[in-house]
From Swiss-Prot:
<comment type="function">
    <text>Essential for mating and meiosis.</text>
</comment>
<dbReference type="InterPro" id="IPR001660">
    <property type="entry name" value="SAM"/>
</dbReference>
<protein>
    <recommendedName>
        <fullName>Sexual differentiation protein ste4</fullName>
    </recommendedName>
</protein>
<dbReference type="GO" id="GO:0043539">
    <property type="term" value="F:protein serine/threonine kinase activator activity"/>
</dbReference>
<feature type="region of interest" description="Leucine-zipper">
    <location>
        <begin position="111"/>
        <end position="139"/>
    </location>
</feature>
<feature type="domain" description="Ras-associating">
    <location>
        <begin position="176"/>
        <end position="264"/>
    </location>
</feature>
<feature type="domain" description="SAM">
    <location>
        <begin position="11"/>
        <end position="73"/>
    </location>
</feature>
<dbReference type="InterPro" id="IPR000159">
    <property type="entry name" value="RA_dom"/>
</dbReference>
<dbReference type="GO" id="GO:0071507">
    <property type="term" value="P:pheromone response MAPK cascade"/>
</dbReference>
<dbReference type="Pfam" id="PF00788">
    <property type="entry name" value="RA"/>
</dbReference>
<dbReference type="InterPro" id="IPR013761">
    <property type="entry name" value="SAM/pointed_sf"/>
</dbReference>
<keyword id="KW-0469">Meiosis</keyword>
<dbReference type="GO" id="GO:0051321">
    <property type="term" value="P:meiotic cell cycle"/>
</dbReference>
<dbReference type="GO" id="GO:0005829">
    <property type="term" value="C:cytosol"/>
</dbReference>
<dbReference type="Pfam" id="PF07647">
    <property type="entry name" value="SAM_2"/>
</dbReference>
<comment type="subunit">
    <text>Homodimer or heterodimer with another leucine-zipper protein.</text>
</comment>
<dbReference type="GO" id="GO:0007165">
    <property type="term" value="P:signal transduction"/>
</dbReference>
Length: 264
């Protein structure tokens, strides 16, 4: 019958003759002479077999019956193979689907972890921004308070300096220079409790220049002197002029400040 894996429509003449011989019919030569192929078997009729020289009606019926039985067996076999192949394809498709589902599940888990991480980082960022915002607002309040206090201090210092001075008078003690004498009264100094006696030499000098509308940037062109006992005295730059002024007042010296323009 030839290769058992081949179906009858693929048989050559030799395979057909071998199949007839295996059935036990003495008609192999007739099938050889007419060169019957597998694709011809399905078309044979009783008259065709008679024309091929098979006179026995019983043999013709048996051959046709064997052909139908063989066709049914191979058809069932083909259907089973198709079912097996379909089942195999379904199993492979299901396996691929499971793999894709597992992959998507892993991706979903990974995505959830990323979302959770981003939510955590976002929460941290919001807390950090809120903290920075709070610190920034506190800093702005401190700056506003410092600016306000600085303005008050400037006003108080100007008021203190003003309370210690009288209108500027020319000083005849320094010839060839532009001098300003600043008198102070003991009573006004004692009454003014806001007086800042810790101002440095340069601070007092610049304050005096500002008060009399002289550019403070020209302070190097002026000296701050103090007059007592009818004599002008130089004030060392490391001495705090207002403290010196107070000390002289306490000793009853009646001191006064003098602005003296240096000679070129």
């Amino acid at each position: 019958m030839g290769d058992s894996d081949d179906f009858y429509w693929n048989w050559n003449n030799e395979a057909v003759c071998n199949w007839i011989e295996q059935l036990g019919f003495p008609h192999k030569e007739a099938f050889e002479d007419y060169h019957i192929l597998g694709k011809d078997i399905d078309l044979l009729s009783s008259n065709d077999l008679r024309d091929m020289g098979i006179e026995s009606v019983g043999h013709r019926i048996d051959i046709l019956s064997a052909i139908q039985s063989m066709k049914k067996q191979q058809k069932d076999k083909l259907q089973q193979e198709n079912k097996d192949q379909e089942l195999k394809n379904i199993e492979e498709s299901y396996k691929k689907l499971e793999e894709k589902t597992e992959h998507l599940s892993d991706d979903n888990v990974s995505l959830e972890k990323r979302v959770e991480y981003l939510e955590t980082e976002n929460t941290k960022l919001v807390k950090t921004l809120n903290s920075l915002n709070s610190e920034f607002l506190q800093l702005l309040r401190k700056i506003a308070i410092n600016v306000k206090e600085g303005r008050q201090l400037t006003t108080e210092n100007s008021s203190d300096t003003s309370s210690m001075t009288h209108p500027v008078q020319p000083s005849p003690s320094v010839l060839g220079s532009f001098d300003l004498e600043v008198n102070d009264s003991l009573t006004n100094a004692e009454k003014n409790r806001k007086l800042n006696v810790n101002l440095t030499y340069n601070e007092v000098l610049c304050s005096m220049l500002q008060r009399y509308r002289i550019d403070p940037n020209t302070w190097m062109s002026y000296d701050l002197l103090i007059n007592y006992d009818d004599k002008e005295h130089a004030i060392p730059m490391d001495v705090k002029p207002l403290q010196l002024f107070r000390n002289l007042q306490k000793r009853g010296k009646s001191p006064s400040f003098v602005l003296s323009r240096r000679s070129c």
